[in-house]
């Protein structure tokens, strides 16, 4: 059923009109940067159902409020990104007491809360888009372990991500692709890691002045032999929705459909993005 939904989504988006470099409610990174001296602030709320956390053994529904991202345009081709969430609330519907770190859980009842891990990254646009070629960029990011093992929401690992970003407007369609490598720490052993391939493909089309419909498939694939360390296996989700831009503010909403047992069976996301001039580059 989920592959059919994805096929319908991608076919529908191929009717497109011009769309600008995209982000919320998607997570596939456009190679275009926000611009020198500009600041981008995005915030939103996610509600995701039937998530499985294999390290803590918890299954349930996750509320992320608010999700926050801030980007600083430090030059015409580079930006610094900071992303995270101030408050995560996980409503537990099932537990696996034999999960690797279930013995560390320290909360009462069927609800746990906590911060989310912080991600700090840098994006560089290497090649600008031209009529005969796509824009090409690179992104490097590090995930810092702010979420705790005791809440069941954190892995306690520091991860590194790097990806090649490609984007092209073809006639009226904005197509963005990501491909890269993530080095994920083993939450049960400090001397082990797992390398996974990351991927993303997004499309965007305008249906009216300042109104777009968007969609993507994004995730990661374990490339190793045997069972991966807990919490480092395959992930994936389809996202589709819309966004409305008025001046320097964009409002968005979307639907999330997970592709693996660890991802949500269904989710909703909504938020806004605001871009303004924050400083002058000397």
Stretches found by the model and what they are:
Residues 1-6:
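Bacterial N-terminal signal peptides that target proteins for export
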Residues 16-18:
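N-terminal signal peptide c-region/cleavage motif recognized by signal peptidases
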Residues 21-282:
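Transmembrane beta-barrel domains of Gram-negative outer membranes and organellar outer membranes
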């Amino acid at each position: 059923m989920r592959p059919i939904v994805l096929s319908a989504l991608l076919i529908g988006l191929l009717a497109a009109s011009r769309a600008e470099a995209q982000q919320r409610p998607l997570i596939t990174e456009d190679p275009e940067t926000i611009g020198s001296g500009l600041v981008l602030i995005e915030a939103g709320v996610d509600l995701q159902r039937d998530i499985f956390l294999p390290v803590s053994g918890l299954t349930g529904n996750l509320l992320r409020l608010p999700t926050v991202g801030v980007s600083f345009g430090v030059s015409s081709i580079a930006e610094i990104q900071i992303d995270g969430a101030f408050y995560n609330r996980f409503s537990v519907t099932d537990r696996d007491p034999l999960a690797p770190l279930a013995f560390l859980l320290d909360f009462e009842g069927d609800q746990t809360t906590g911060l989310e891990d912080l991600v700090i990254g840098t994006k560089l646009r290497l090649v600008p888009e031209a009529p005969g070629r796509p824009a090409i960029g690179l992104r490097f990011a590090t995930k810092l372990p702010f979420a705790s093992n005791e809440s069941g929401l954190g892995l306690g690992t520091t991860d590194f991500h790097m990806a090649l970003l490609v984007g092209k407007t073809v006639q009226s369609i904005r197509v963005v692709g990501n491909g890269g490598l993530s080095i994920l720490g083993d939450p049960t052993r400090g001397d082990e890691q797992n390398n996974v391939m990351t991927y993303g493909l997004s499309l965007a089309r305008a249906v009216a002045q300042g109104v777009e419909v968007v969609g993507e498939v994004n995730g990661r694939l374990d490339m190793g032999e045997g069972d991966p360390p807990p919490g480092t296996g395959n992930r994936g989700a389809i996202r589709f929705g819309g966004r409305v831009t008025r001046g320097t503010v964009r409002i968005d909403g979307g639907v999330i459909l997970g592709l693996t047992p660890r991802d949500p069976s269904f989710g909703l996301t909504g938020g806004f993005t605001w871009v303004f001039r924050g400083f002058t580059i000397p």
